[in-house]
Curated annotation (Swiss-Prot):
PROSITE patterns: PFKB_KINASES_1 (PS00583), PFKB_KINASES_2 (PS00584). Belongs to the carbohydrate kinase PfkB family. It catalyses: pseudouridine + ATP = psi-UMP + ADP + H(+). Disulfide bonds: none annotated. This is Pseudouridine kinase. The lineage of its organism: Bacteria, Pseudomonadati, Pseudomonadota, Gammaproteobacteria, Enterobacterales.
Length: 313
């Protein structure tokens, strides 16, 4: 990575609040337990992972003028991410995700308050237009509005845009703009939603990939669960990368780590197939850690993991 290169990440940032009950829950009563506050959000997580991988990562997001907002910016900055271009919205709540889990670890209910993502507007992004257009790569997540995503794709100039679909419900925001996206990282359900083609197994993947490339997408990195990852680009390169055997502790953040790995490899000029394998290593490290973002993530640790990993098929 050249010293002047940097990555711009545009997406969500929120505080995750999780309540863990010590015993079976008694409803309509106060239950003893443990409450954890952790920084989260797809864009923010990707930015932190990029910083851990040695990149200059700038997060463009929105927080409220409340305690959570200040805490979120401080913690994110302490993790190595530049947050000076984040928008602080007076009188608005910082995006938060509140979950309640019983003593077995099962989530019983959750409430999300993410309205502040609507503050990430085309006008806000345009204020940082020149900075965005000088990035080595732009990463966007589909938590932001369709208007904001459209601005990014219309104004990226020659900067490649990597998009995290986030969910089957949110990925439709970019369905008509695949020709403006460099790399898309969907899972099986997101790919089915976008293409309208059923993905029953490995035999359907080439057909789905062809649909994406016919609609102009440059690179597809398709997570197929236990089958591994299928990757293809518009020039014809394609293949399967086997899943890495992992002791799964926490599934939250694995996809964010994978996207960070893909973007980091692009900055470093790594070949496509090697990039996918490296990104899987990043995901494996996230899965094997109790935290959403594994503090031990580094290029050296990922390479070591990938070189010594046991494949599942």
């Amino acid at each position: 990575m050249r010293e002047k290169d940097y990555v711009v990440i545009i997406g969500s940032a929120n505080i995750d609040v999780a309540g863990y009950s010590h015993e079976s829950l008694n409803y309509a009563d106060s239950n003893p337990g443990k409450i954890k506050f952790t920084p989260g959000g797809v864009g923010r997580n990707i930015a932190q992972n990029l910083a851990l991988l040695g990149n200059k990562a700038w997060l463009l997001s929105a927080v409220g003028s409340d305690f959570y907002g200040q805490s979120l910016l401080t913690q994110t900055n302490q993790s190595g991410v530049y947050v000076d271009k984040c928008l602080i919205v007076p009188g608005e709540n910082t995006s938060s995700y509140l979950s309640l889990l019983d003593n077995t670890g099962e989530m019983l209910v959750a409430i999300n308050d993410m309205n502040i993502s609507n503050a990430i507007t085309a006008e806000y992004l345009a204020q940082h237009g020149e900075f965005i257009q000088r990035a080595k790569v732009i990463v966007a997540d589909c938590n932001i509005s369709e208007e904001a995503l459209a601005w990014i794709l219309d104004n990226a100039a020659n900067v490649p845009v990597f998009v995290d679909p986030v969910s089957a419900w949110k990925c439709v925001k970019v369905r008509d703009r695949l020709n403006q996206i460099h790399t898309l990282k969907p899972n099986r359900l997101e790919a089915e939603t976008l293409s309208g083609i059923a993905l029953s197994g490995r035999e359907d993947v080439a057909k789905v990939a062809a649909w994406f490339h016919q609609h102009g997408l440059n690179r597809l990195v398709l997570s197929m669960g236990g089958d591994g990852v299928y990757y293809s680009d518009i020039s014809g390169e394609s293949g399967w990368s086997a899943p890495i055997k992992t002791n799964v502790i926490n599934v939250t953040g694995a996809g964010d780590a994978m996207m960070a790995g893909l973007a980091s490899c692009w900055v470093d000029g790594m070949p496509f197939a090697e990039s996918v394998r490296f990104a899987q290593g990043c995901s494996s490290m996230a899965l094997s850690c109790e935290y959403t973002n594994n503090p031990d993530l580094s290029i050296a640790n990922v390479i070591s993991l990938v070189e010594n990993a046991e494949c599942l098929n």
